[in-house]
Curated annotation (Swiss-Prot):
This is Wall-associated receptor kinase 4. Residues 1-22 form the signal peptide. GO terms for cellular component: membrane. Its EC number is 2.7.11.-. Glycans are attached at residues 34, 56, 109, 115, 132, 182, 208, 293, 318. It catalyses: L-seryl-[protein] + ATP = O-phospho-L-seryl-[protein] + ADP + H(+); L-threonyl-[protein] + ATP = O-phospho-L-threonyl-[protein] + ADP + H(+). The active site is at residue 535. The modification Phosphotyrosine is found at residues 483, 582. It comes from Arabidopsis thaliana (Mouse-ear cress). Belongs to the protein kinase superfamily. Ser/Thr protein kinase family. Serine/threonine-protein kinase that may function as a signaling receptor of extracellular matrix component. Binding to pectin may have significance in the control of cell expansion, morphogenesis and development. PANTHER family: WALL-ASSOCIATED RECEPTOR KINASE 2-RELATED, WALL-ASSOCIATED RECEPTOR KINASE-LIKE 21.
Length: 738
């Protein structure tokens, strides 16, 4: 007996769970493929509403069908979604009928929903849908055009594509397409010269003139179409509420005689089942549509078909807002109002003070940034950039905050190097790109002019062997320049310093010399305004990961007007690389860079520093060192043993002679950088005969020594030299290394 009772309880529980799902009758399939069925629909015997065969579906190969139309969705909200194929007509090249088909359907007790449109594709065509097969009771649209326009993509406006709403209520329909009679000039929708007509749910078709729609000729391809369904033959007045399940509501159908059911508010499920509408627990559901709206001063209590908010002690429910409020104690209410009003007033005052302070701080910061901008030469930069001719560089203005973040607050661990014109930091921008940030020395106003000059010069340069300027920041106490990051240090580091590389072959060094010479030739001759670098040295030549040379540090550079060959300036440069003629006269020209390049070329050949006080007195300067070695025919003694071999001796000798020619005492005797670049390039790619002289007069050698000896002698006892030349003070940075 107990076993029988347990069995009955189990059956009751299973039946109740099945009804809670609100989908189908017990023991009936709930799905066909991916489509979920709901009563009154079904496809197994006894699973659909027996009084109406329209609810009898068929499931074939996991696909659900209704009267030959594939069903993709069923809803107990009285709608069925099916796939309806397109009708079409195709014409041959003479405009004659080639093939085509159209479709008609008897929907039984189901009717076409008003949420569909009739659509036509193709020029000079029209489509219609009829409820009885005759055109006089049809709804359609016309598509007229001479040729398809891609400008109409995305919308059916009557040009190549048209659409028209379809009224609800039809249960027997035919869909057809036609072409205007005697029109053979039609530009078709695709290569097949076909026109199409089809029903489609609103918003489910997007027109594109470039698409090929020939796939619509496949009977198994269709567009979603919405059908309305109801229980036919009786109205709610005739059947009463008993025909809908418990907690269900009956509504008359809008299309013909019939009715539909829906669950009352607070219930959900299938209203066509006796116990299909189940209570919604608003207190626990995660569905935001049904979830309760009780305030934090109350707790939610679920009721059948609704819920109730229970207020805490000393609170009562406001039925208008469904929120809890303090109970009507005048003293309590007054005290609460006073505290609340005082708190709000205090917060408003604090907020106002905070806003005023924030605004004042922003104003002060803006004024300070503007002050720094002017102090750092921002106005001068804008004026010079506007008057310097066309710019090849898009100079980006960085913010002070951005520079702090990029350098981690100018952390010492980010310092890449320090020189006469400031400190260089490694920076990381928000996009994770690595840059080099050059910061002028604090309190050195002379650096401002050099920074502005560097921006001005680099704005005129667009060359692969020049370090690229990305932008600047002038709203800080000292100006900042932002460059591309070159990862492998300087040429000085590789030849003499911490990054000394014994594998720096002759091919590497010759290529670097060609790149540096080509860059200087570009600056002198090909830039929009001729540029003299004025501080060429191995410490200002950067190398990337491929050992490609990049000329850097244009702080001392000068733009030379087109109508001038020389420019009188304060003498500036690095001892060991400084042109003796420029040092003595104060007149700067492109031959000054030629001299400095000759010194760099000698360093590449010998691996020796430009100035070395460990060498003999007469050879402290590398120019004297080379001159004496050339004169005494012992050049092989000073060439770096890492580069010379029996296969490249002639090339190295030619390169050495080029270096000596570049360092002649007077500029007139030196070649131009174009000639130097051409000769070095010839050494690199061919074995052509060298055009430089093979012998050097003894008098010229003496001139080399005399000019260099003066610089060396003056530089042995002082870190800086004061020289009164044409009433200008010359300041020379003595940097044997950097």
């Amino acid at each position: 007996m107990k076993v029988q009772r347990l069995f009955l309880v189990a059956i009751f529980c299973l039946s109740y769970m099945q009804l809670v799902k609100g989908q189908t009758l017990p023991r009936c399939p709930e799905k066909c493929g991916n489509v979920t069925l709901e009563y009154p629909f079904g496809f197994s015997p006894g699973c659909w509403r027996a009084e109406d065969p329209s609810f009898n579906l068929s499931c074939v190969n996991e696909n659900l069908f209704y009267k030959g139309l594939e069903v993709v969705e069923i809803s107990h909200s009285s709608q069925l979604r099916v796939l309806y194929p397109a009708s079409y007509i195709c014409y041959n090249s003479k405009g004659k009928f080639a093939k085509g088909t159209y479709y008609w359907s008897n929907l039984g007790n189901l009717t076409l929903s008003g949420n569909n449109t009739i659509t036509a594709l193709g020029c000079n065509s029209y489509a219609f849908v009829s409820s009885n097969g005759t055109r006089r009771n049809s709804v359609g649209c016309i598509s007229a055009c001479d040729a398809l326009s891609h400008e109409a993509n995305g919308e059916c406006n009557g040009e190549g594509c048209c659409q028209n709403p379809v009224p609800a209520g039809n249960n027997w329909l035919i869909v057809r397409s036609y072409r205007f009679d005697n029109d053979t000039s039609v530009q078709p929708i695709s290569e097949g010269q076909c026109i199409y007509a089809f029903l489609v749910e609103n918003g489910k078709f997007k027109y594109n003139a470039s698409d090929k729609y020939s796939y619509l000729q496949n009977r198994n391809v269709g567009f979603p179409v919405v059908l309305d369904w109801s229980i036919r033959g009786e109205t709610c007045g005739q059947v009463g509420e008993k025909k809908c399940g418990v907690n269900g509501i009956c509504s008359n159908s809008a299309s013909g005689i019939g009715y539909t059911c829906k669950c009352k508010g607070g219930f959900q499920g299938n209203p066509y089942l006796q116990n299909g509408c189940q209570d919604i627990n608003e207190c626990t559901t995660a569905n935001p549509i049904h979830k309760h709206n009780c305030s934090g001063d109350s707790t939610c209590e679920n009721k059948l078909g609704h819920f109730r908010c229970n207020c805490r002690s000393r609170y009562e429910l406001n039925t208008t807002t469904n929120t809890c409020k303090p109970k009507g104690n005048p003293e309590y209410v007054e005290w609460t109002t006073i505290v609340l009003g005082t708190t709000i007033g205090f917060l408003v005052i604090l907020l106002a003070i905070s806003c005023i302070e924030h605004k004042m701080k922003n104003t002060k910061d803006t004024e300070l940034r503007q002050q720094f901008f002017e102090q750092n030469g921002g106005g001068m930069l804008m004026q010079r950039l506007s008057g310097a001719g066309p710019s090849n560089v898009d100079v980006k203005i960085f913010t002070e905050e951005g520079m702090k973040e990029a350098t981690d607050g100018y952390d010492e661990n980010r310092i890449l190097g320090q020189g006469g014109q400031g400190t260089v930091y490694k920076g990381i921008l928000p996009d994770n790109s690595i840059v080099a940030i050059k910061k002028a020395r604090l309190g050195d106003n002379s650096q401002v002019e050099q920074f502005i000059n560097e921006v001005l010069v680099l704005s005129q340069i667009n060359h692969r062997n020049v370090v690229k300027l990305l932008g600047c920041c002038l709203e800080t106490e000292v100006p900042l320049l932002v460059y591309e990051f070159i990862s492998s240090g300087t040429l000085f580091d590789h030849l003499h310093g911490s990054m000394f590389d014994s594998s720096l072959t002759w091919e590497h060094r010759l290529r670097m010399a060609v790149e540096i010479a080509g860059t200087l030739a570009y600056l002198h001759s090909s830039a929009s305004i001729p540029i003299i670098h004025r501080d060429i040295k191995t410490a200002n030549i950067l190398l990337d990961e491929n050992l490609t040379a990049k000329v850097a540090d244009f702080g001392a550079s000068r733009l030379i007007p087109m109508d001038k060959e020389d420019l009188a300036t304060m003498v500036q440069g690095t001892l060991g690389y400084l042109d003796p003629e420029y040092y003595n006269t104060g007149l700067l020209n492109e031959k000054s860079d030629v001299y400095s390049f000759g010194v760099v070329l000698m360093e590449l050949l010998s691996g020796q520093k430009a100035l070395c006080f460990e060498r003999p007195q007469t050879s402290k300067h590398i120019v004297s060192y080379f001159a004496s070695a050339t004169k005494e025919n012992r050049l092989h003694e000073i060439i770096d043993g890492q580069v010379m071999n029996e296969n490249n001796q002639r090339e190295i000798q030619k390169a050495a002679r080029i270096a000596v020619e570049c360092t002649r005492l007077t500029g007139e005797e030196r070649p131009g950088m174009k000639e130097v670049a051409a000769e070095l390039e010839a050494l690199r790619v061919t074995k052509t005969k060298h055009k430089w002289s093979d012998e050097y007069p003894e008098q010229e050698d003496t001139e080399h020594l005399v000019g260099v000896q003066k610089l060396s002698a003056q530089g042995e006892t002082s870190s800086s030299i004061g020289y009164d030349s044409i009433r200008n003070v010359a300041i020379l940075d003595i940097e044997a290394g950097r």
